[in-house]
Regions:
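Hydrophobic alpha-helical segments at protein termini of multi-pass membrane proteins
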Residues: 1-220
Length: 220
């Protein structure tokens, strides 16, 4: 089985979006707001790495991966799995935002700080979670085609590992091609969402949520 050019093209498009959208967004934001500092961007990226890619994964290990009655229940009930995933992401990422604005960025004023932070938080997620994943997948499928198909590629590994590798590759190749394109497009709305959440948490920490909501009410 060879990989279709449509799938490879969609992987490439998503990789470009995921890798370069955060950079373009930061450059445009920096050009339009020359006085902003890069510190909030770096803090946002660092918070995502620490809270989402490190601390949250430790929690996932104990709740999802480690064999226990809890993991069996959560993995065995789709509603519990979805609820846990949503709560875990919310708790860890919003706690990270809160602590960042409360400590490292406590002296930073104005919504520009929150927006710059949001670009860093959502941008590094886009690059690490989707961008690198798409690049890795694209390299893999190009190698499969260069080898003449899945079976020739699988033959390169030891016999005891071939079954698992073949199953994983077939799962990847049977994924609808448009799914890979959607992964990149979804990053656009996700980064916007991260920026919006960062602004909300920023004003919450500053105690200005109510005032801003009232201002919005009277303006509208």
């Amino acid at each position: 089985m060879n990989v279709s050019w449509v799938m490879m093209m969609n992987m490439g498009i998503s990789a470009v979006i995921a890798l370069f959208l955060p950079i373009v967004l930061l450059v445009v934001w920096k050009v339009k707001n020359r006085g902003i500092r890069m510190i909030p961007f770096l803090v946002g990226a660092g918070v995502f790495i620490i809270f989402a890619l490190f601390l949250e994964q430790i929690c996932h290990y104990f709740v999802l991966s480690r064999v226990s009655p809890l993991s069996e229940y959560v993995n065995g009930h789709i509603w519990a799995f979805v609820l846990y995933g949503a709560l875990a992401a919310g708790v860890f990422e919003e706690t990270g935002r809160f602590l960042a604005f409360k400590t490292v960025l406590r002296r930073s004023k104005g919504k520009e700080t929150a927006i710059t932070y949001g670009i860093g938080h959502g941008g590094i997620e886009s690059i690490l979670v989707v961008g690198i994943s798409m690049i890795s997948s694209l390299i893999l499928v190009v190698a499969i085609n260069a080898m003449g198909g899945v079976e020739n590629y699988v033959a390169l590994v030891p016999a005891e590992a071939q079954g698992v590798l073949r199953e994983n590759l077939n799962t990847l190749l049977l994924t609808p091609a448009h799914t890979f394109l959607l992964a990149g497009i979804e990053r656009i709305s996700t980064i916007i969402f991260h920026i919006a959440l960062s602004v909300i948490v920023f004003f919450a920490v500053r105690g200005e949520v109510y005032q801003n909501l009232m201002h919005l009410y009277f303006v509208s």
